[in-house]
Amino acid sequence: MESKLKKLVEFKELSNLYIDLSEDILKNLIFDLSIKDKQNQLLFINCIENSISSLADHIHTSFSNQIESINHLNFKYKWVELSKLETIKNVIQKELDNDGMIEMIEDSKKRILSINNNNLISSNKENDLKKFSLILNKYKTFNELLRKILEEC
C-alpha cells in the first residue's frame, strides 16, 4: 500500500512564509561577530535561499510542460534552469550575474562561514545590515516582477 504525502502548503505560500521569517530575523541582527549573531545571519540567508527555492518551484509549476523537473537542484541551479525559458529569461539572468541577488547571497554566506585570518591583509568587507537589507529588497522586487509577468502570461 502506497501512501502519498499531502501537500500542506503551496510553494507560493511557503515562499512568503520564508520571507516573513527573514524579515523578523533581520530585525534582530546586530552584526557584532558573535557566534549567536553569525548563526542568525546564516538563518537569515537560509530563509532567503528557501524562499527563492520555493518561488522557483512555484514558477516551475506554470512551465512544467516546457522544462524538466528542478526538484533535485539547489536554489541557484533551479534559477539557472528557469532562465532557459524565453518569457522570464531576462529577469532571471540579471539576478544570476556577478552583481545580482543570487551572487550576493552566496557571497554573504561565504563571508559568514569563512574563518578570519588576522595574518592576511585583505579588503573583504564584512556582512552588514545594509547588505542584508539590499538582498531582501532585491528579492522582493524580483519576486513581484516575476509574479506580474506570470499573471500577464
Indicate where each model-derived feature is located:
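Amphipathic, well-ordered alpha-helical segments in soluble domains
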Residues: 17-25, 47, 54, 138, ...
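Short acidic alpha-helical/loop segments enriched in Asp/Glu that coordinate divalent cations
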Residues: 31-34, 58-75
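Charged alpha-helical initiation segments
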Residues: 1-39
